[in-house]
């Protein structure tokens, strides 16, 4: 909370998107609220909101299927717990993102099941008139690198495009689909714009996850390079803020 308060004091207008569901659960545990279940999670998120938290990222969802989760993501929070955190966040008025890590040991059926679960949670959120909801879905390709699953090949380019296109068709109740260029590569993100993505993320100067898993992953793009890539793909670049509102600079 001190970090949030300090940031808001120094930059009062800044929007803070922080803390994955995994980190929220960890905060509940170390603050002795982990045993309180949903109430403990709600207490933690409410306290973070009071000190400046504006929204949640979507990390940590991995793949919801229990078999896959137990085999590939031992020690991480379950899909059910991830959903609990985001459901509480939405009820408290926060928007969030949803992710899916694909291309490892899961099946295509597991991916579809994951998307259906996200879709159903968004439907519940809309039906209950929650002031928060999922803003974007982000399919993330598995990058073998030096992980424990390094012998796996990871998804092909065609598999990446199909997964994103299917997510856009299935998740029509989620406004945005992101082609996260730093994991997809900027070239793949260009193709994904043609397959249903409407967001490729920002400049990103350093992304520890991909840097650990693959030292060859490019870590930065200039604004000019991003705009050029978007235009080359046949689209007009638009700068947005965290809540997907268009940013205007110098009246443009």
Where are these regions (language model features)?
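Auxiliary Fe-S-binding modules of radical SAM enzymes
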Residues: 15, 29-32, 115-116, 123-252
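Conserved Radical SAM active-site core
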Residues: 1-120
């Amino acid at each position: 909370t001190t970090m949030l308060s300090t940031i808001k004091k120094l930059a009062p207008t800044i929007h803070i998107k922080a803390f994955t569901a995994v980190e929220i659960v960890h905060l509940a545990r170390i603050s002795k609220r982990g045993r309180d279940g949903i109430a403990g999670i709600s207490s933690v998120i409410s306290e973070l909101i009071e000190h400046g938290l504006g929204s949640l990222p979507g990390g940590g969802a991995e793949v919801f299927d229990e078999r896959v989760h137990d085999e590939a993501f031992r020690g991480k929070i379950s899909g059910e717990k991830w959903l609990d955190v985001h459901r509480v966040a939405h009820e408290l008025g926060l928007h969030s993102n949803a992710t899916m890590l694909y291309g490892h040991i899961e099946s295509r059926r597991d991916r579809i099941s994951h998307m259906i679960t996200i879709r159903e949670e968004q439907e519940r959120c809309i039906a209950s008139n929650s002031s928060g909801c999922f803003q974007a879905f982000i399919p993330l390709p598995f990058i073998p690198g030096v992980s424990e699953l390094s012998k796996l090949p990871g998804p092909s380019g065609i598999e990446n495009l199909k997964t994103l296109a299917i997510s856009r068709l299935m998740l029509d109740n989620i406004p945005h689909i992101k082609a996260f260029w730093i994991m997809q590569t900027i070239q793949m993100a260009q193709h994904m714009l043609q397959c249903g993505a409407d967001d490729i993320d920002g400049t990103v100067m350093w992304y520890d996850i991909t840097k650990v898993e693959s030292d060859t992953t490019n870590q930065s793009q200039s604004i000019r390079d991003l705009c050029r890539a978007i235009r080359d793909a046949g689209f007009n670049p638009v700068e947005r803020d965290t809540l997907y509102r268009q940013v205007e600079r110098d009246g443009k």
